[in-house]
Amino acid sequence: MKTLLILTILAMAITIGTANMQVDPSSQVQWPQQQPVPQPHQPFSQQPQQTFPQPQQTFPHQPQQQFPQPQQPQQQFLQPQQPFPQQPQQPYPQQPQQPFPQTQQPQQLFPQSQQPQQQFSQPQQQFPQPQQPQQSFPQQQPPFIQPSLQQQVNPCKNFLLQQCKPVSLVSSLWSMIWPQSDCQVMRQQCCQQLAQIPQQLQCAAIHTIIHSIIMQQEQQEQQQGMHILLPLYQQQQVGQGTLVQGQGIIQ
């Protein structure tokens, strides 16, 4: 209301001043003496200056922060550029170059099929192996004894080969059952011959007896074994012949 009153007073003063200027030009000198005219300028400058700058604080803060944020998605579009050059360049040169030269390896497998022909000839070497134990027996040499002593020891050798056991029976009973048996005669001869041999040579003589008995038993066993091995060896030779025929068929 104050502002309206001030405006009306100013309008009335202006109209009165203009009317006086038109009527009396000499009255222009009296206008500077009137001081109440510049007073209405003070409320106009005080009241609106305080209210109008307040809304200016809200507008620059809010919109300025929100608009630069949408610039972030521009970084995400640059990422897909990395996987496209990396993936296709690596697998294409590596894979096709390696498998093609590997197909040349099956050419080596064909000459390997000739190896089974050598395996059939191997069993031929194994058959004469049973003859090897014959070499070990003659290596055992008896101690050297004079031929005269060997003849003296022969009754003891014969006594042992007959497997007589006069010690297990009482001498009286033995004489009653077999008064003059072969074992008793050979035992007496052996004792007589050993008594004639010097004591230094008795051990060597007994050793020769035992060694000769062992050699005779081994020879008998070998002869019996040869009778058994000969038919087996013949069967093996027949089997080798069939294998050779089979090789000819395979070839």
From Swiss-Prot:
Q: Give me the stretches of Low complexity compositional bias.
A: 42-81, 100-139
Compositional bias of type Pro residues: which residue ranges? 82-99
Q: List the disulfide bonds.
A: none
Question: Which positions make up the signal peptide?
Answer: 1-19
Q: A GO molecular-function term, please? A: nutrient reservoir activity
Residues covered by region (Disordered): 26-143
UniProt KW Signal keyword: yes
Matches recorded under InterPro entries = Bifun_inhib/LTP/seed_sf, Bifunc_inhib/LTP/seed_store, Glia_glutenin
Q: Give the record's keywords alphabetically.
A: Repeat, Seed storage protein, Signal, Storage protein
Which PANTHER family does UniProt cross-reference here? Answer: GAMMA-GLIADIN, PROLAMIN PPROL 14P
Q: What else is known?
A: The gamma-gliadins can be divided into 3 homology classes. Sequence divergence between the classes is due to single-base substitutions and to duplications or deletions within or near direct repeats.
The task this protein performs is described as: Gliadin is the major seed storage protein in wheat.
Protein family membership: Belongs to the gliadin/glutenin family.
- Entry protein name: Gamma-gliadin
What is the organism of origin for this protein?
Answer: Triticum aestivum
